[in-house]
Regions:
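Second-shell loop/turn segments in exported
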Residues: 30-37, 54-60, 79-81, 101-112, ...
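Acidic, Ser/Thr/Pro/Gly-enriched interdomain connector segments
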Residues: 2-58
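Bacterial extracytoplasmic/cell-wall-associated proteins, especially those involved in peptidoglycan
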Residues: 100-208
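Short acidic, glycine/serine/threonine-rich helix-capping segments at coil-helix boundaries
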Residues: 33-41, 49-68, 72, 76-91
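Short domain-boundary/entry signatures in modular proteins, especially
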Residues: 90-99
Length: 208
């Protein structure tokens, strides 16, 4: 009888374990990093690594190290520090990535403050009634940025580009509110010269 009871108990334990496996798998799946515009978690981890938040081997699964990296990102960008990539964090990551691509494509040869200036122009346009009101719409507005036209936008941003975006998002604006900038040597439309220049940073003139 004792042996029988042990067998019954052991079988019950195994049954519980096997019943729990689907639940565990479902929970693990929920912790994979995914979201609109992202193929898998590796892209987010790679972005976090470029930004200095994550330095482990990149995989597609969520773990403690990734959660810590996400939490640090959230704290730096004013989001609830949940450690999980929900809709708000996903949107912020995407907006930062788009802005970093523009900064890198347009100003990678400029000083850090010049890069901050380009990021500030994007944010100033979002706030202006004369431009679209989202990061994506501003960046991809027709003929708005040379880097989008000539595909330099597709280059992978470096750490400096991300840092410049963060600086601008923190309220630093060396352009004094500019919504335009240009390099006189590369101007193809004289219309830009009709804009009032507010300041010059490196090779870029920033205008209202």
């Amino acid at each position: 009888m004792k042996i029988l009871n042990q067998n019954i108990f052991g079988g019950a334990v195994l049954a519980v374990v096997f019943l729990c496996l689907p639940l565990a798998e479902a929970q693990a799946a929920q912790h994979r990093i995914s979201g609109p515009g992202v193929d898998n978690g590796e892209e987010i981890r790679e972005q976090l690594a470029r930004m200095g938040y994550y330095d482990e081997d990149v995989t597609g699964y969520f773990n403690f190290i990734t959660s810590n990296a996400v939490t640090r990102f959230q704290e730096d960008y004013g989001l609830p520090p949940t450690g999980i990539v929900g809709p708000l964090t996903q949107m912020k990551l995407e907006n930062v990535e788009m802005m970093a691509k523009i900064v890198h494509g347009e100003a990678r040869g400029e000083s850090f403050i010049g890069k901050v200036g380009v990021a500030a122009v994007v944010l100033n346009r979002i706030e202006s009634p004369d431009f679209p009101d989202s990061t994506e719409e501003v960046i991809f507005q027709r003929n708005a940025f040379t880097a989008v036209i000539d595909d330099q936008y597709l280059l992978t941003p470096n750490r400096s580009a991300y840092d410049a975006v963060k600086e601008a998002m923190d309220g630093v604006d060396p352009t004094m509110g500019a919504v335009f900038y240009y390099n006189p040597a590369g101007v193809t439309d004289d219309w830009i010269f009709s804009r009032t220049v507010l300041t010059q940073i490196g090779r870029h003139f920033f205008a209202e």
